[in-house]
A protein has these predicted regions:
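Amphipathic alpha-helical segments within well-ordered protein domains
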Residues: 47-51, 66, 86, 102
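Acidic catalytic patch
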Residues: 65-91
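Residues that scaffold the ATP/ADP-binding catalytic core of kinase and kinase-like folds
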Residues: 11-13, 49, 123-124
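Acidic, PIN/NYN-like endoribonuclease modules and their adjacent C-terminal/linker elements
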Residues: 1, 102-134
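Short, well-structured N-terminal submotif of metal-dependent ribonuclease cores
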Residues: 1-38, 53-60, 66, 133-134
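Short active-site oxyanion
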Residues: 33-36, 73, 107-112
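Alpha-helix capping/helix-boundary segments
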Residues: 8, 42, 81, 100-101, ...
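Short beta-strand scaffold positions
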Residues: 4, 37-38, 76, 96, ...
Length: 134
């Protein structure tokens, strides 16, 4: 098994560089089913890059994340948390990374994730505001 960096995962979707896309696809095929590990940071960077650099819409980002999570070639870090984060991301205002880290934290036994992020605070019961100083 090998792990994939975000740029390799992105190249598999990118038609602007056919040579790198072909190399990334060949690498994944050569590893076989479950032979490529994608960790939580790569998933977050992937979603962020699609949104910020590629200017993709939330629906397309969600579809691409879902395709990664369901592809048999990939072993995903924290797959249950990633799936729950994706479900929240589809309908919520926060970034995928916010939901994913909060789901990981919840699985670790944390009641909430403290944040200053207003979108995350509006998003769900996974987050709580950092209290004001008295």
């Amino acid at each position: 098994m090998i792990a994939l960096d975000t740029n390799v995962v992105l190249r598999m979707l990118d038609v602007t560089d056919p040579e790198q896309r072909a190399r990334a696809d060949a690498l994944v095929r050569a590893q076989g089913l479950g032979g490529c590990f994608i960790n939580a940071i790569v998933l977050c960077e992937f979603a962020w890059t699609l949104a910020r650099a590629y200017r993709r819409q939330r629906e397309e980002i969600a579809e691409r994340l879902e395709a990664l999570l369901e592809a048999p070639e990939f072993l995903i870090s924290e797959p249950e948390e990633a799936a729950r984060a994706l479900a929240r991301y589809r309908d919520g205002p926060a970034d995928f990374a916010d939901y994913f880290l909060a789901e990981i934290n919840r699985s670790a036994g944390c009641a909430n994730t403290a944040t200053f992020d207003e979108d995350a605070l509006k998003a769900s019961d996974l987050f709580c505001a950092v209290p004001a100083l008295s």
